[in-house]
From Swiss-Prot:
Annotated family: Belongs to the phosphoglycerate kinase family.
Binding residue positions for ATP: K211, G299, E330, G359, G360, D361, S362
UniProt cross-references to Gene3D superfamilies, sorted A to Z: Phosphoglycerate kinase, N-terminal domain
MF annotations from Gene Ontology: ADP binding; ATP binding; phosphoglycerate kinase activity
Protein name: Phosphoglycerate kinase
Compartments, as annotated in UniProt: Cytoplasm
Lineage, uppermost ranks: Bacteria, Bacillati, Actinomycetota, Actinomycetes, Mycobacteriales
Residues where substrate binds: D24, L25, N26, R39, H62, L63, G64, R65, R121, R161
């Protein structure tokens, strides 16, 4: 990665300098409580290194989709509190993004202080398609930092977005890749350029349309592509099988037919499914062969025979990439498929395989199921960004660091 890194910045000395850090702190909340602090934990090393080096650290991040205006339920207050706990030092929270409070607090910072700006997406310019609007916000962020400031990009989950705090601000300040962004790119480069064989990919999630580009990109390059989750039922429909009330993207059926024809030796789909009579945690359920889904029932997980088959593939692999759960893991009755796949990947890792969990719902599933992060070589913090990287797309937030 031909970019300046956080190590370069620290080696040059940060004492007394103000450093703006774009972190990815977009964690799940339930009633204001953080249910999975994984992204905050992953962001802490960069922030800790800067603060301990004597920098005045200003953190910018988003939470949820607040529609370009302040919304109390998307305040970063619980995130700032959790970050303070993890860092073991005070984290101030500004009452605005680049307004009077943010400016006053930034001017009052002393060496080693950490200031978090309020949710950057409270400002509509952050995600504007109008470059001039984004640049105005980027300049306001630079004003908080001052003339000898620096920018550290450490929010891997947003580097595929051309947004003010990710892309435009990097053009206005000396810019560096944080520890997290550097590690993520290194891992993904290994998956694309240096993967040990056999190479197995597991894709789940609800929609084929969300994963089509990555299927097209990876199918010619891997040994096995395992398909599960809600999108599997569109592949079933492509084989002329009735899927009952299961999720199915009618518009993608022909595309799935083409994929199954072209990559018959590579694509593996479940042979049995766990079906339910309704979408609920306490629905009546049963295990049926893939071609015997009853009318009015829906598939909510892969079945035990499929778990066995997939586990045999995965435990024999030397490289594994997993993105997307196998079923509705949030309901205990339908978590077994996702758990079985996760445990098989852990076993492969114990045997020496290089395993990557591709962020998003997969990372949430791993943690909800109580499987230690250490069971995998790497858990990505960026679902969409990791997929776009594997698709071969340019990531604006990385490209600008290379410029």
């Amino acid at each position: 990665m031909a970019v300046q890194t956080l190590k370069d910045l620290l080696d040059a000395g940060v004492e007394g300098r103000t450093v703006l850090v774009r972190s990815d702190l977009n964690v799940p909340l339930d009633g204001g409580e953080i249910t999975d602090p994984g992204r905050i934990v992953a962001s802490a090393p960069t922030l800790r290194a800067l603060a301990e080096g004597g920098a005045k650290v200003i953190v910018t991040a988003h939470l949820g989709r607040p529609d370009g205006q302040p919304d109390p339920k998307f305040s970063l207050a619980p995130v700032a509190a959790k970050l303070a706990e993890i860092l073991g030092r005070n984290v101030q929270l500004a009452g605005d993004v680049v307004g009077q409070d943010a400016l006053a607090r930034s001017e009052g910072l002393t060496d080693g202080d950490v200031l978090m700006l309020e949710n950057i997406r409270f400002d509509p310019r952050e995600t504007s398609k109008d470059e001039a609007e984004r640049v105005k916000l980027a300049k306001a962020l630079v004003e908080l930092v001052g003339d000898d400031g620096a920018f550290v990009s450490d929010g891997f989950g947003v580097v595929h977005r051309k947004q003010a705090s990710v892309f435009d601000v990097a053009k206005l300040l000396p810019h560096y890749a944080g520890y997290l962004v550097g590690a993520e790119v290194e891992v993904l480069a290994k998956l694309t350029q240096d993967a040990a064989r056999p190479y197995a990919v597991v894709l789940g999630g609800s929609k084929v349309s969300d994963k089509l580009a990555v299927i097209e990109a990876l199918a010619p390059k891997v040994d096995t592509l395992v398909i599960g989750g809600g999108m599997f039922y569109t592949f079933l429909a492509a084989q002329g099988v009735s899927v009952g009330n299961s999720l199915c993207e009618e518009s993608m059926i022909e595309t799935c037919k083409g994929l199954l024809d072209r990559y018959a030796d590579v694509i593996h789909i479940p042979q049995d499914v766990v079906v339910a009579d309704s979408f609920s945690a306490d629905a009546e359920s049963k295990i049926v062969p893939f071609d015997k889904i009853p009318d009015g029932w829906m598939g909510l997980d892969i079945g035990p025979e499929s778990v066995k088959r997939f586990a045999a593939i995965l435990t024999g692999a030397k490289t594994v990439f997993w993105n997307g759960p196998m079923g509705v893991f949030e309901f205990p009755k339908f978590e077994a498929g996702t758990r079985g796949v996760a445990e098989a990947i852990v076993e492969a890792t114990e045997k020496g395989a290089f395993s990557v969990v591709g962020g998003g719902d997969s990372a949430a599933a791993v943690r909800q199921l109580g499987i230690p992060d250490e069971g995998f070589s790497h858990i990505s913090t960026g679902g969409g960004a990791s997929l776009e990287y594997l698709e071969g797309k340019e990531l604006p937030g990385i490209a600008v660091l290379e410029g």
